[in-house]
C-alpha cells in the first residue's frame, strides 16, 4: 500500500466512526424508564430545586456547585444518576429541570434527548406560535412543538433546528433538540 494512502485511511476511519450515530433511545424506552422510576425522577427534581441555578455533576473539584451541595444530596444524586443512566442535571433557577439522557453530533451541529420538568412549557410554546404568526420565516430556522407523536419520526420531517417535546405527565416531557 502506498504511504500516501495511509493518512487518507486514518482520516476516513476517524470520520466513519466519529460520524456514526449512536443508538439514540426511543421515546418508548424513555417513557418506560420514566414510568418504572417515576419516584426517582421526582427525587432528582426535588433535590435540584433546593439549589439556585443548579447543575450536576460539577465540572471539577473547584466548581462552586461542588461546594454548595450537601454530602447527603451528593450521595443520593450520584446513586440516582447511575440508576437512571442520566448524564447530567440542570436547574434553571425558576422552574425547569433538565435531565440529559443522550447526546450526538459534533461541536457545530448535533443534538440531545433529555427528560425535562417544565410546568410552563405550554406557555413558552404559545409565545413561540405567536412569534411565528407575526413572522412565518421563523420556522425556516427553528421549529418548536409539543406533540404526542414519536419525536424521532417528527424530527425527520424538518431540516432545520428543532425543539420537540412529548408529554409524559404532570409537567414532565421528553425533549429532543437538534441544531443544524
Residue positions per predicted region:
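Sec-dependent bacterial lipoprotein signal peptides
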Residues: 1-17
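Residue-level signal for the start and early helices of compact helical domains
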Residues: 7-10, 25, 32, 68, ...
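Extracytoplasmic electrostatic interaction patches
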Residues: 84-180
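Hydrophobic alpha-helical segments, principally membrane-spanning helices and signal/leader peptides
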Residues: 3, 22, 154-156
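Generic low-complexity segments that are intrinsically disordered, proline-rich and/or Lys/Arg-biased
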Residues: 3, 8, 26, 58-59, ...
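N-terminal export/targeting and maturation segments
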Residues: 19-91
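Hydrophobic transmembrane signal anchors and adjacent membrane-proximal interface regions, especially
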Residues: 3, 49, 66-69, 140-145, ...
Amino acid at each position: 500500500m502506498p504511504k500516501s494512502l495511509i493518512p487518507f485511511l486514518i482520516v476516513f476511519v476517524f470520520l466513519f466512526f466519529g460520524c456514526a450515530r449512536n443508538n439514540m433511545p426511543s421515546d418508548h424506552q424513555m417513557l418506560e424508564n420514566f414510568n418504572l422510576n417515576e419516584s426517582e425522577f421526582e427525587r432528582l427534581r426535588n433535590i435540584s430545586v433546593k439549589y439556585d441555578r443548579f447543575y450536576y455533576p460539577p465540572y471539577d473539584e473547584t466548581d462552586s456547585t461542588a461546594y454548595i451541595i450537601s454530602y447527603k444530596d451528593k450521595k443520593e444524586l450520584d446513586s440516582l444518576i447511575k440508576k437512571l443512566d442520566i448524564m447530567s442535571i440542570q436547574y434553571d433557577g425558576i422552574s425547569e429541570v433538565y435531565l440529559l439522557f443522550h447526546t450526538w453530533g459534533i461541536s457545530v451541529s448535533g443534538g440531545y434527548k433529555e427528560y425535562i420538568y417544565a410546568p410552563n412549557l405550554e406557555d413558552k410554546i404559545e409565545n413561540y406560535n405567536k412569534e411565528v404568526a407575526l413572522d412565518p420565516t421563523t420556522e425556516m430556522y427553528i421549529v418548536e412543538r409539543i406533540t404526542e407523536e414519536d419525536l424521532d419520526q417528527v424530527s425527520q420531517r424538518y431540516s432545520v433546528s428543532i425543539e420537540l417535546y412529548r408529554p409524559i405527565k404532570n409537567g414532565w416531557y421528553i425533549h429532543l433538540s437538534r441544531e443544524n
